[in-house]
Amino acid sequence: MAFLKLYVIVLGCAKNEADFSLFKYHLKQLGHEVVDDVEDADGVVIDTCGFIVDAKQESIDTILEFASIKKQKPDFKVYVTGCLVQRYPKDLPLEIPEVDGWFGVIPPKNLAESINKTKKYITDPVAVYEFEGRVDSDLPYAYVKIADGCDRACTFCTIPKFKGGFVSRKLEDIEKEVRYLIENGKKEIVLVAQDTTGYGVDLYGKQMLPELLKRINDIDGNFWIRVMYMHPDHVTDEILKGFSYEKVVKYFDIPIQHSSDNILKLMGRTKSTKELEELFDKIRSLYPQAVLRTSIIVGFPGETKDDFEQLIDFIRTIEFDRLGGFVYSDEEDAASYNLPNKVSLKTAQKRLDTLMEVQAEISFLRNQRLVGKVIDVLFEEEVNGVIIGRSYMDAPEVDGNVFVKGHGINRFGKVKITEADTYDLEGELVE
């Protein structure tokens, strides 16, 4: 087998980033080289997203962009993997024959072993990996995938159809990976899965996220543990107790998708408006410093003006610290595709604009309360004498930043906040 210099592109979610940190390790173990510039590469590996229309289009555009390189460099290899391939295994090879290898959702080691082989298309059922090693960026945080697949039945979502059922990794293997990361200088461990609250149920017969948090918390070192993607229907009292450990940041990422009982029912969600409100009240009662993040879909089939107004009232009542908003994507193989009373794109976009305007007001006011306070910041980047970081209140890539004059990254520092806008903070080092 010829060894290749490969340029790697990761599209989509943090779970893909976690997978490809391991994939790059296995590529190197096999003798391939991962390069930072496509001009130096013999080929490209593209990890795709197949979740919604915009993500699919981005993936296809990226594939076509790199396939066009073959016009000038006929020997340039193009390998495509990930959720888009798993979702459309027959259509893609027919539509884009320039691609040298199509690989579905397979473990990182298997994927690395498949590169530069003669097989045109490979797909396996979803499988989790055992940790052997990983190659990460110089950033001080790392994503660790604790499970894959999903057993939920949200009507707008197609992920279970191409990712398979929920499969957890073993406690010991996750702990081994986290120890490796901490020993190699990481300051923040971000736990990800389709639904982190479901971790362990398939392996151990019960939710094991609290036990996992305890084990990671017991690892020596000064670092944060952040939990992402918690399904609101399964945030139990035991799960909430797991956040009491010292290194677990009090950051609760709980995508509710909507708050109207009518829309929640159509979405296949089980918690009611009242139960959601009680959940967030409980979290803030247990952890006064809690930061609440959620995701919202507007324009879902059947969403009336009253449903949307109820949603806005709910957002104003809860005052989420962080919120991501999206227009409903009408996926052809999702159950919601067959629902009546579709909302026009124009109306949905207008509702999204309104939602984000309301959230901007809330975010600004909540950030203003931080002015004059001293907070811990993890510094990640330095630009022209300004160091840029995040507090525990902000997750990587999706939330805001803290800007401070100074030097030195990949470290914690205490910062007194001097200015605050809607999403970002400015401050000065106090130690």
From Swiss-Prot:
[4Fe-4S] cluster 1 binds at residues 13, 49, 83. The keyword Membrane does not apply. GO terms for molecular function: 4 iron, 4 sulfur cluster binding; aspartic acid methylthiotransferase activity; metal ion binding; protein methylthiotransferase activity. Its cofactor is [4Fe-4S] cluster. Disulfide bonds: none annotated. Its EC number is 2.8.4.4. Residues 368-431 form the TRAM domain. The keyword Nucleus does not apply. Keywords: 4Fe-4S, Cytoplasm, Iron, Iron-sulfur, Metal-binding, S-adenosyl-L-methionine, Transferase. [4Fe-4S] cluster 2 binds at residues 150, 154, 157. It is found in: Cytoplasm. Residues 136-365 form the Radical SAM core domain. GO terms for cellular component: cytosol. Its main location: cytoplasm. Gene3D superfamilies: Methylthiotransferase, N-terminal domain, Nucleic acid-binding proteins, tm_1862 like domain. Residues 4-120 form the MTTase N-terminal domain. Binds 2 [4Fe-4S] clusters. One cluster is coordinated with 3 cysteines and an exchangeable S-adenosyl-L-methionine. InterPro entries: Elp3/MiaA/NifB-like_rSAM, Methylthiotransferase, Methylthiotransferase_CS, Methylthiotransferase_N, Methylthiotransferase_N_sf, NA-bd_OB-fold, Ribosomal_uS12_MeSTrfase_RimO, rSAM. PROSITE patterns: MTTASE_N, MTTASE_RADICAL, RADICAL_SAM, TRAM. GO terms for biological process: tRNA modification. It catalyses: L-aspartate(89)-[ribosomal protein uS12]-hydrogen + (sulfur carrier)-SH + AH2 + 2 S-adenosyl-L-methionine = 3-methylsulfanyl-L-aspartate(89)-[ribosomal protein uS12]-hydrogen + (sulfur carrier)-H + 5'-deoxyadenosine + L-methionine + A + S-adenosyl-L-homocysteine + 2 H(+). It holds the Pfam family UPF0004. Belongs to the methylthiotransferase family. RimO subfamily. Catalyzes the methylthiolation of an aspartic acid residue of ribosomal protein uS12. This is Ribosomal protein uS12 methylthiotransferase RimO. The gene is rimO.
